[in-house]
């Protein structure tokens, strides 16, 4: 456990009753996080019940609900070619009209929401978990910190879209490339966040006392580092969701994302961009959904950040 402290504590108080020499993992002075780790998350979840947090939760909730119920709500199969006219405007049968190959735009948007959410809700947590694990190891310092920092620097040197184009050239377009781009983009973000938390918490007096008393690295990480990292993780997770929505939409818009005929919001927006004058809702529909989803996650992130400052 010597890695967690850079100096030995040899103060006279160490020999006094109640001093660091008497401390054991079960006797370390309690902190708010020690008394109830859930307290770290309560302000965050309460922020979703009012103001910006509530507005963001409602927006994200509506889009998620539409995506979850897409197979039920979609009036037609997403790739079904209909008997109606090409690029038909909105009407009672086709609320958002039809596209350039005579498919119902509303059905494709609903199924596109579902595809996008599956990608985002899978890729971001995977990137967060991998980045957090690397950040925990790096925060203990040693050669692992240097290696992790250099890896983070290399990844961050490439803008997300440049990284997407490079990976697509190797792997080909598709869901696998999108997921990998999002995961790689999030690893250094969460890695540096957790590393900073570890470096900050390890210098606190009660953590140093626990280390001197013989507490293991795992115990210190579990009791002190992780509870104190929940709030910044929540803020970054919400923000990363909005970034991931943009990355997926941009990749599909450029034709290097979800492969047709599978619908995605970015690919529908790309197709509709060519027919703005004929059927503007062809492009406006997916654009509104992407905007609402991104705005919702941003509002949640801002609400979480405000709750941390209270």
Residue ranges and their predicted role:
Residues 95, 99, 136-140, 144-200, ...:
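Generic hydrophobic transmembrane alpha-helix motif, especially the helices
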Residues 162-166, 174-186, 233-268:
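Non-cytoplasmic
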Residues 105-109, 117, 151, 194, ...:
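Short hydrophobic alpha-helical segments within the ABC transporter permease transmembrane module
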